[in-house]
From Swiss-Prot:
GO terms for molecular function: ATP binding; DNA binding; helicase activity; hydrolase activity, acting on acid anhydrides. Residues 490-644 form the Helicase C-terminal domain. PROSITE patterns: HELICASE_ATP_BIND_1, HELICASE_CTER. It comes from Yersinia pseudotuberculosis serotype O:1b (strain IP 31758). The gene is rapA. Belongs to the SNF2/RAD54 helicase family. RapA subfamily. This is RNA polymerase-associated protein RapA.
Length: 968
């Protein structure tokens, strides 16, 4: 093409320079000025890597002064182009714009514009873009979005609760599973779903101070959710940036004490427009009608301002009716306003629970029972269902299940309360206690005597705690460097035990970090035992490394030495040997220690080793836990109640272990109390609520469906392809592990989700669970989600040129592979992607206007193609530009029919699903007052907005690839 001064060209290799202008021409060279950057470039006149910029009718172009022109006519004179059209700001027609006046910062966003401007991508990027579109569309349609990306075992009851609650608008529920059943994971899954679906954007978690780090770790490790921990110092820092410090972060964890202490903070929190509030240990919020506690009032004030509320609490039976009512009152004060009324109402639900037990028992129903069921369900046309349930036919079981579902819907608090018990959930291991009584060394005897004399002024509480840890008493008198481990028989026993069990992973827990560190040194120096240490002084990354070292089968540590606080929130169910080097002060901490191994998914019996020193507080506490509470070999739901009521008597025995008069009787009384409370709990079990909470077959199906998705080979190949193209370094390790690190040539300088020092990932859920340092990669992992966004929100792969070597076709045959996207723009919370995700429609057009896509599958076609360098691609495009325009016009006519069909299907599906959901809730409102008006209103509004937005759905060209046939 002849060059003329003033022509506009773009660089094929440096498109970031913008639009260039020809400013000098000589015999062999031309000079382009790029006004956007002020740079000049010298190019050879022949075969230079630049492309002439020419726009077509219907394009919109920008003048260097900023106004835009809709092109209607293109004229050319002396090698220079003039565009004629309508000015968009003034609507003036017949306006002429010479090409020299085009805006130099011009960027090409439409695929065809980029193609004609020579901004042509590599072929593999086009393929990645199409796959990204295809897989993203498929993932949006799956019903369990937000559930499968978690780094946790697929446990049916947890998945069921999370699915049920996570799908709701502003859920307000009580999660009251027994200890060890995973309330934190359920809450995390609900948060994850709400965030992914756009139902929530700002989340506040309020927990006791001791659990802050546990929640921080759980949210990050299991759900890849980065919360900010707000304490006094963080609050002061944020105050410098904003009048309301809580507006500076989207997801915040803080302690209840942090909020309670300062009225201004509470008001700022309440004003910070949160979408979801999560409160752990909610059973500690004391309430009475006359005098609610300050803590209760704090949460009440927050719950009034925040639409969604999750309360995590002990089981209702443990709390008592009044305390249980107080939690429900936080969720819905209009519904639960009168305690007496609540008690009467609860009694009315007893027959419903009995009816469910009857139906599930499979026994024949008497006429009285049939009448009772008819009255309870109170539906027209219920007779055939009752008849089928009482028959011997094949339909009997299905009819009974349907009746149970109807009863569940009418159950008083089943929509706001979820509670599973260990009796209702199978899969827990047995626990076996081994008590190892050891002699009390004379050094400790002396230290304890002296401590008794010198510590006489200490409180009973402080003396009791001292007596449990004699090594600390000894160090108080002998100095911090006193070598207590040289004579403490527990150390000798531990060494021998570990040597005898070299093949076993052993978790050792002690109260203090210092004890753990000293034990590690002894194990290493005396028996060369490999041990990892885990305590509160370590950073999150250091704890991950220690846990990974312990988890590794090949060259890992045999022992993990944990302090009390350091072990919070970590689970090691691949080990089954637990050594308690000392004992914690209360039953909750004891259960927490055992809970590190006693989880669903533990496949072996848990061996609990308790070496203790005779004639000490340790010996008394072992007896009280085992004989009084049965807390070692079984979970102890009564522990906190009995601990609180017998606290004074217990600490007086612990503070003076030599005075044991009445101890046997005290332990016997505690055991009787324990058995009595346990019986009450068992009798008070609400089997209907348990059925509703564990989800039955629905939970099983969810777990199975997600497990099948876990082995998705498409994810692995797509992810590796994505890492290659983004420029992320990959290093294979053993055991299905890959180490990802940033490179110097990535598509973006900082890839979101990839730490600067890299991370270890695996596509295997079990592997991720056994390796603390390995992240579990699924379609929901931030690296994959951010990778999809990076590719699809930008121009990567939006145009390409390839060669097809095929002697069956004439040389020069031209094909245009077009990828259109059918989509609707709408606020994220409407979740339009359930019905119409951005859906790719692929077309393969020939010169005759025929679409060959149905006959030529993408992957097999892609494998036959060869890449072309950018410069050659530009020349090819210029040669066939007019033909491509014709093909695009032909494709537009064809894609409209396909797009409209997709949109109509989405509208029908949305209307059916949302109308059914709405009708069900409205019908249930008549028989179950726990269905909130605002929930129905939100669903009604949601349905209206979804259908409106689907009506406005459209389609656009997302990517184009020209394919030219060659025989070489």
């Amino acid at each position: 093409m002849p060059f003329t001064l003033g022509q506009r060209w773009i660089s094929d290799t440096e498109s970031e320079l913008g639009l260039g202008t020809v400013v000098a021409i000589d015999v062999r060279m031309i000079t382009l000025l790029f006004p956007a950057t002020g740079e000049n470039r010298l190019y050879a006149r022949n075969d230079s890597p630049i492309t002439r910029v020419m726009f077509n009718p219907s394009d919109t172009i920008t003048h260097h002064e900023g106004w835009q022109l809709k092109v209607e006519e293109v004229t050319q004179e002396n090698g220079l182009i003039t565009y004629i059209g309508t000015r968009l700001d003034t609507e003036e027609t017949g306006v002429a714009m010479r090409e020299v006046l085009l805006d130099s910062k011009l960027t090409f966003s439409k695929p065809q514009d980029r193609l004609f401007a020579g901004q042509i991508d590599r072929m593999d990027r086009f393929a990645l873009r199409f796959r990204a579109r295809k897989y993203q569309s498929e993932q949006f349609r799956l019903p369990w979005s937000g559930l499968r990306g978690i780094r946790a075992s697929l446990i049916p009851h947890q998945l069921h609760i999370a699915y049920e609650v996570g799908q709701r608008h502003a859920p307000r529920v009580l999660l009251a599973d027994e200890v060890g059943l995973g309330k934190t994971i359920e809450a995390g899954m609900i948060i994850h779903q709400q965030l992914l679906a756009g139902r929530a954007e700002r989340v506040l978690i309020v927990v006791p101070e001791s659990l802050q780090h546990q929640w921080l770790v759980e949210m990050l490790r299991r759900f890849n959710l980065r919360f900010s921990l707000f304490d006094d110092s963080r609050y002061s820092e944020a105050l410098l940036d904003s009048s309301n410090p809580f507006d500076t972060e989207q997801m915040v964890i803080c302690s209840l004490d942090f909020v309670r202490r300062n009225k201004q903070r509470l008001e700022q929190l309440a004003d910070a427009s949160w979408d979801l509030l999560v409160v752990d240990e909610a059973h500690h919020l004391a309430w009475s009608e006359e005098a609610p506690s300050r803590e209760y009032q704090v949460i009440e004030q927050l719950a009034e301002h925040i639409p969604g509320v999750l309360l995590l609490t002990a089981t209702p039976e443990q709390l008592g009716q009044q305390s249980h009512f107080a939690r429900l009152r936080l969720l819905d004060p209009d519904r639960f306003h009168d305690y007496e009324e609540f008690v009467n109402e609860q009694q009315k639900y007893r027959p419903i629970a009995d009816a469910v037990t009857l139906l599930l028992g499979g026994e024949r129903l008497t006429d009285d029972k049939l009448n009772l069921l008819g009255e309870l369900i109170d539906e027209q046309d219920i007779e055939p269902l009752l008849k089928a349930a009482n028959s011997q036919s094949e339909d009997s079981e299905a009819a009974r299940q349907e009746l149970v579902t109807m009863l569940m819907d009418r159950h008083g608090t089943s929509r706001v309360l979820f509670r599973n018990t260990r009796n209702g959930v199978k899969g827990f291991p047995h626990r076996v206690l081994h008590q190892i009584k050891l002699p009390l060394p004379t050094q400790y005897q002396t230290a304890i005597k002296v401590s008794g004399i010198m510590g006489a002024k200490k409180t009973l509480d402080a003396r009791a705690k001292d007596m449990l840890y004699p090594e600390q008493i000894y160090q108080e008198f002998e100095g911090e460097n006193a070598t207590w481990w040289n004579f403490d028989p527990r150390v000798e026993w531990l060494l021998n035990y570990l040597v005898a069990n070299r093949g076993e992973k052993v978790l050792v827990i002690c109260a203090q970090a210092a004890t753990a560190l000293q034990l590690e040194q002894v194990l290493r120096e005396r028996e060369a035992i490999r041990a990892a240490v885990f305590h509160e002084g370590l950073s999150l990354i250091e704890r991950d490394r220690a846990a990974a070292y312990f988890a590794s089968e090949e060259d890992g540590a045999q022992v993990l030495l944990c302090s009390e606080i350091g072990s919070e929130g970590r689970n090691f169910q691949f080990a089954c040997q637990l050594v308690m080097f000392d004992l914690p002060f209360n039953p909750d901490l004891l259960e927490q220690r055992i809970g590190r191994l006693d989880r669903i998914g533990q496949n072996r019996e848990i061996q609990i080793m308790v070496p203790y020193l005779e004639d000490t507080a340790q010996a008394i506490l072992v007896r009280w836990y085992h004989e009084g509470l049965d807390a070692f070999e079984h979970t102890c739901p009564t522990g906190r109640t009995i601990y609180d009521s017998s606290y004074q008597e217990l600490i007086s025995y612990l503070a003076t272990p030599s005075e044991q008069e009445g101890l046997d009787e005290f332990i016997h009384t505690c055991r009787q109390q324990h058995e009595g409370l346990k019986l009450q709990l068992e009798q008070g079990r609400d089997r209907l609520l348990e059925m509703h909470s564990n989800g039955g077959e629905h939970g099983q199906e969810l777990a199975q469906s997600i497990a099948e998705q876990d082995n998705d080979i498409n994810l692995v190949s797509f992810a590796l392809n994505l890492f290659d193209i983004v420029g992320i370094n990959q290093e294979d390790r053993s055991d299905n592990l890959i180490v990802l690190t940033p490179s110097d040539h990535m598509l973006v300088p900082d890839f979101p989700g990839l730490p600067p020092d890299g991370c270890t990932v695996t596509f295997d859920r079990e592997q991720a669970l056994s390796r603390e340092d390995a992240q579990f990669v699924s379609w929901e992992h931030p690296i994959i989600r951010n990778g999809l966004d990076l590719i699809l929100s930008g121009d990567t792969g939006s145009c390409a040129v390839s060669l097809l070597k095929n002697k069956a076709l004439p040389v020069g045959t031209l094909l245009a592979e077009l990828v259109y996207v059918v989509e609707a723009q709408a606020p994220k919370h409407l979740q339009l992607t359930r019905f119409l995700p951005p859906t790719p429609v692929r077309m393969l057009m020939d010169r005759n206007g025929t679409n060959l896509a149905a006959q030529v599958e993408f992957e097999s076609f892609n494998r036959q193609l060869n890449a072309v360098n950018r410069h050659t691609s530009s020349k090819l495009v210029n040669a066939v530009q007019q033909e491509v325009h014709t093909m695009l016009q032909q494709a537009e006519a064809l894609v409209e029919a396909q797009a409209q069909a997709l949109i109509e299907t989405a509208k029908r599906e949305a209307d059916d699903k949302l109308s059914t959901e709405l009708a069900r809730l409205e019908a249930l409102k008549a028989v179950n007052p726990n269905i909130r008006d605002d929930e129905i209103e939100a669903l009604e509004h949601n349905r209206k907005m979804v259908l409106e937005n689907l009506n406005q759905a459209g389609w656009r060209l997302d990517a184009i690839r020209l394919v030219v046939v060659t025989h070489q």
